[in-house]
Amino acid sequence: MRFPRLMTWLLIALFAGPTATGALAQTPPPPPPPSQAAPQPKPGDAFGEEVTLAAKTIVFAKGSANWDSAFETLVEAFKNVYGALQKQGLKAAGPPMTIYTATDDTGFEYQAGVPVTEEPKGPLGEGLAVGKSPEGRALKFIHRGSYDAMDSTYEAITNFLDEKRLEARDLFVEFYLTDPLTTPEDNLVIEVYVPVK
């Protein structure tokens, strides 16, 4: 899963940061202007809410990527999926999603999918397929802000699972409530679903 990467970054930040005396002598950077500040969690945002995911028919691009280019890779995958839907005259039946099927410290395998109202009639094109989204018991979390800032959300999710002694299945799903193709990255709103055993 993505969580080992987070721990690596935390350790690097702790041990590679400025020394205590250097930190005292430095002036903190000014806060970003309000228009550039990342959206904050809002009252009522889900955090560990138990839900039941229903399987949906999706058209998806399957691939792998490294974490450094994760968002850009997913945006390109969604462009391919939406292009195929347009050619087939199909309509989306919900927000786009990424299903992470394997992760490690350097990268991940994914299915970047869009739910559809009906299955495609003809061939989709190279690298695209039709399948079902995950179903069953899951925990729902909300992330607001850039994709790069998601490590803090995943850290909170890991802590929540540990505290509740819950075991996650070997995948997780992100639903993009804001369009990842057109929304400024700092304004993303993403539902994270963690299927649990």
What are these language model-derived features?
Residues 2-197:
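A solvent-exposed interaction/effector surface
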